[in-house]
């Protein structure tokens, strides 16, 4: 991705985007199939997303460049989506 003449790899958001898509799909599948174990797995997956966010925050605070900032911003939105998958999973567990 090119931003203001700089080439950005957006490595953290690229890495986590696949996990977040898996979480969203998994939470929907858990709901449709009334699958508590799948719901629990979604909750566990969130730890990886959160840890990646903390790592990216640490790196962005030290590098302060446009690419790190953009990667962090996208990652924060992805982390929020992952949190919604966790909320769905938690409701499934309570419902069943």
Indicate where each model-derived feature is located.
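Cytosolic, long alpha-helical scaffolding segments
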Residues: 1-96
């Amino acid at each position: 991705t090119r931003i203001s003449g700089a080439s950005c790899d957006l490595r953290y958001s690229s890495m986590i985007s696949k996990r977040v898509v898996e979480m969203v799909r998994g939470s929907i599948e858990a709901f449709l199939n009334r699958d508590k174990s799948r719901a629990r797995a979604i909750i566990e997956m969130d730890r990886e997303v959160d840890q990646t966010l903390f790592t990216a925050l640490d790196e962005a605070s030290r590098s302060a460049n446009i690419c790190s900032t953009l990667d962090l911003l996208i990652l924060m939105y992805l982390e929020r989506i992952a949190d919604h998958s966790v909320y769905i999973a938690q409701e499934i567990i309570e419902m069943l």
